[in-house]
Amino acid sequence: IESYDIITYLEAKFPSPTLIPESQRDKVGALLNFEDRLHMDLRALTMRFFVPAAIVQRSDAQLAQYHAAGSGQVRGSADDHKADEMAFWRDMKEHNGVPETRTKAAVEAFPAAFDDHEVALAMRPYLLGETLSVLDIAWYVYANRLRGAGYPLAHLHPRVGAWFAKLDQ
C-alpha cells in the first residue's frame, strides 16, 4: 500500500501528532490491508457514477504498455494488484464502462465494512480511539466518494455518518 508506506515514512519523520498509535501498529496494518482490498470496488463505483467511460477508457496499446511496465513485484513479492488492475481495465474496455455485475458486487462490498466501523464508533470518537488516525483518513476518502455516488451513509450507518460529518467540517 503506497499511501501507507508514505504515512509510515511521514510518521517516522514527524512523530507528532501521531497518526499510527504505536500500540496498534499491527492492527492498523491489517485494517489498512482490508481497506486496500476494497480499492477496486471503490474504483468501480467511481468509474460507474462519477467519470464518463470515454474519459478513462484504456486503448489496447495502453493496456499492453501497462502490462509490460514494472518488475511485477512490490517489496520483493509478486504484485497481485497488477492482475486485478489489468482485469478491471479490460472489463471497462470490453463493456464500454463498468459492467452492471461489477457495480452490484462493488455496492455489496461496503455495508459490512461500515457496519464494523459503526460498532467501533459506538465505543470511541474515532476508528481507533480518542484521536484521529491514518485509518480515519483512509476511510474518510472511501466514505466521501461513496456518499457522492449516492450511498446512504448516514441512513444505513448513523455513527459513521456522524463521524464523517465531524471530519468533513
Regions found by a protein language model. Give the residues of each.
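GST-like domain detector, emphasizing the conserved glutathione-binding G-site
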Residues: I1-S77
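Non-transmembrane alpha-helical segments in soluble domains
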Residues: I7, E11, G29-L32, P111-F114, ...
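Surface-exposed cleft-lining segments at the edges of enzyme active sites
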Residues: F14, T18-L19, H95-A106
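A structural motif
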Residues: A68-N96, E108-D115
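Alpha-helical packing segments of well-folded alpha/beta enzyme cores
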Residues: P99-R102, A106-A120, Y142, W163
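Surface-exposed helix-capping loop/turn segments at secondary-structure junctions
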Residues: V119-E130, Q169
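GST superfamily/GST-like fold recognition
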Residues: L127-R147
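Long, positively charged, glycine-interspersed low-complexity recognition regions
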Residues: A143-Q169
